[in-house]
Amino acid sequence: MNRRFDFGRLAVALALIILLIFGIDFIRRSLIQLFHKQPEIQLEGGSSVSDTVDSVHEPVGTGAATTPASTEDTSSAAGYDTERFTTVSKPYTEVGAGPLILVNQEHPYTGSGSELASFSGTKNDSFRLKNFGLMVHSDLLTPLNDMFAAFSQATGLKNVMLYSTHENYAGGMYDTTIPERQTGYCVDLSLLQDDGIGRFTGADKYSWIVSNCTQYGFVQRYPGDKKNATGLEENTWHYLYVCTPHAALMKQNNLCLEEYLEWIRDYTPSGNQAAITVNGTYYEVYYVPAVQGNTTEVPVPKNDAYTISGDNIGGFIVTVQATIGGSGT
C-alpha cells in the first residue's frame, strides 16, 4: 500500500534543524567572547580604553619610529598659564647660584666666585674702603654706589667704610665666621673716625642706612630678633644683597632670609605670585621646586623681563619685572 508523503512535517523538521544550528552557533560565539574578552584600563574621569591596539602607524615622512616622550615631570610647576609663560631649562647645579642662596653649615656654598669684581674705576667718593683689594659680586657695584651717594646727600657724611666683603678676617674687628661671605653678596660696614675704625651700629644719622637699605636691595642679614631662625647673634654691621623686590618683601613681612625662603614657596606660577612695587617698578615673585639631580623646566614670562635665582636648598625663585598690575609697598 502506498503512503502519502507529508511535506508539512518535513518543513517543520527542517525549520527545527535550522534553529538548532543557529542556536549552537550563537552559544559558540558567546563562549568565545566570554573567554577572550580584552581587559580594559580605567582612565581618569571614568572613561576607559582597551590595552591592545590593532596597529601602530609610523608618522608619514619621518623615516624612523618616534621615541615616546618621557613621563617625568621636569617643570615642577604644572598648570601655569601657557598664554603668558614659556619655560627655560635650568640644571640642578644652578640651585646653588644667585643672590637668594642660603649659605650655612647645612647648605655649603658651591660656587666658584668667578663673578667677583673690584671697585677700581667704579667707586664714587661717598664711602670708604678698608683696602683696595676688597671685591664684591659685580651685581653689588651699582647699588652700593647709589645707596651711599643717597646716604651722603641726606646726611652730609662720607665716612662709612666697607671693612670686609667676601673674606673672613681672623683676629679682625669682625672675626665671626660667616660662610655666605664667599658669595660676594655681602658687606661688613664700619666707620672711619678720628681715633680709628669703629663698629657700625646703625645709630644716629647712620640709621638712614638701616631704614633705606632695602630700596637698594640690601637687608641686615642677622637681626637681633631672628636668632632662632638664623642661628647667629645680631650683627648690626653685616648686610646682604638680595635684590630690591626681595629686600622690600622681607622688610614688609618682617622676615629674615631663612624665613623668606620658606614663605616664598607658597607663591607659584600656576597660583598667586607675591607682588610689590618698589621705586615705581612693579614686581611679581614666585617659586619653582627643582627636579632633584635633573634639569628643571622653569616657567618664565614671554614678554616681561625676569631673573632667576637658586635658593641653595632645592628650588628656583623667579622675579618678574611685570608690565601689569601694581601694589604699593
Which role does the model predict for each range below?
Residues N2-N235, Y239-T329:
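Extracytoplasmic cell-surface/polysaccharide-interacting catalytic and binding patches
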